[in-house]
Amino acid sequence: MKRQKPFLNGLVIILLFSIVIVSIVIYLQRSPADDQAGREDDVPSEQHEQNEGKEEPNTKEPPELPMWYLDGPFELPIAGAAGYASVKQTLYEEPKADAAILSELAPGTPFEIREESGDYWLVETNSMSGWIEHRFAFINLPDVVPSILYNHTNSYDSRFKTSYLDIPELTGKALNPMIDFNERLEEEEYIMPILYQTAKKVFHAQQLALQNGDSLVIYETFRPRELQLLVNESMEKLAEENEEVAEGITGEPWSITWFINMNVSNHQRGLSLDLSLAEVNELTDQTIGDFKVLKVKDHTEYTMHTPIHELSAESAVFDRPIASADREGWKELEVNPEMTEPALKLQDYMVEAGFNPLASEWWHFNDVDALEDLKKEAGTGEFFIRETVNSTPQWEDITPTQ
């Protein structure tokens, strides 16, 4: 054992010498930034207090772009999307009901949505910005669910007919042009305003459709009160002159109000929509701002038992009327035997997403939850919508609620 001692002593000396050499190398390789960081640790406490009030620079690492938007209620973030006031809305300085009031937005006022905080949106109009309660606000569907097919025929060629006859002053007319160059999508697109809470259900229905090789085809969401009255008056006048038309909309058990509502309808409130269904022949993707979204490149619209907006009992879903707000009663009714399989599929998608069907029109669905939420506070649609105020979606604008 004594013979091994010189060897062990030598090994210890070599190890100590190596540690010293490594320490010297590390010291010499220290950067000025390291020295500065060390000195910052010695900053007096009062200077630390001054620094605490300073904002840290944005160190958010940029993701690989374009990216899929997977964390929100839509295909694209709401930041930058177009929105509209459906009623007179208070503009607050902060996102809370007791905040200072900046102004009021008139019904129909267009704005850009910038941020969401709880029950409020930060919005920007052409002249001001502030927070509004989004419960009463519309959002433009193409801005957040661009994969849906949109065809607002009332913008260029109204499909309204009754008993397959043209309705004077309506059929084939541009009754309500709702199309604009959409800065966000960088193309002309129809304007499809709908309540924010209802829009989330529409997105759900589109997801269900896409999973089964289909896509929604939306023809109309918001309809101005003035147009509603025009359709009603034209229908009544034609029915007075034509017995066939009268029988088609008033024969038992139906009445004209089942095809055109004489009162404020759910279209004016922003919680219903008219739509059809298409088979997707080719599905691809497209880039919008910093995001990738699905795009239906080719489709074939299904044939239903009547054309859309054929306002007569021929278009009925069930054998008799039932209140549109009845959540369960319609499930007990006899289905119109003329209903096609695609019409039944459309109903399945919409019902699973939270909508109620309308007994008299296969294309019309209501959001009863929104109706019960807003009650008499809902809008009456006494305005027109002609423009979009929006911007390209950017990843930096995403917040956890968007």
Question: What label would you give each PLM region?
Answer:
Residues V22-E40:
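Sec-dependent signal peptide cleavage junction
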Residues G38-L76, E124-F160, G172, E183-R184, ...:
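Boundary regions of SH3-family modules and the immediately adjacent low-complexity/disordered segments
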Residues N140-T401:
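Cell-envelope/glycan interface and biosynthesis
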Residues W68, L102-R135:
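SH3/SH3-like beta-barrel superfamily modules
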Residues A81-T90:
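Short, basic/aromatic beta-hairpin or loop at an interaction surface
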Residues K2-L16:
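N-terminal Sec-pathway targeting helices
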Residues V87, D119, M128, L271-L273:
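Envelope-exposed proteins and targeting segments
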Residues E94-A100:
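Short alpha-helix capping/helix-loop boundary micro-motifs
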